[in-house]
Amino acid sequence: MLKSFLIFLVRFYQKNISPAFPASCRYRPTCSTYMIEAIQKHGLKGVLMGIARILRCHPLAHGGNDPVPDHFSLRRNKTDISD
């Protein structure tokens, strides 16, 4: 139930708030999509993963492919950092 509500909040952001600003996420998937996938895969710990990802996403970040890892981690998924 809480997971569904958190995902609803992120989707609300994606549909109603995000379009008002230029795209700026340096990662794939985007930070909001990453948050949804992390919540689906890791439950409430996924929220922490999503927040850590948002904090990593800044103009000096290298960006690139950073999928949600299969195990809980607050660090970047380094399976494919060649992008």
From Swiss-Prot:
Compartments (UniProt record): Cell membrane
UniProt similarity note: Belongs to the UPF0161 family.
Chain spans, region Disordered: 63-83
Function noted in UniProt: Could be involved in insertion of integral membrane proteins into the membrane.
Xref: InterPro entries: Membr_insert_effic_factor_YidD (IPR002696)
Membrane topology: Peripheral membrane protein
Alphabetical UniProt keywords: Cell membrane, Membrane
Main location: membrane
Amino acid composition bias (Basic and acidic residues), ranges on this chain: 68-83
Keyword field contains Chaperone: no
Pfam family for this entry, one: YidD
GO CC, alphabetical: plasma membrane
Protein name: Putative membrane protein insertion efficiency factor
HAMAP family linked: UPF0161_YidD
Keyword Transferase on entry: no
Organism: Streptococcus agalactiae serotype V (strain ATCC BAA-611 / 2603 V/R)
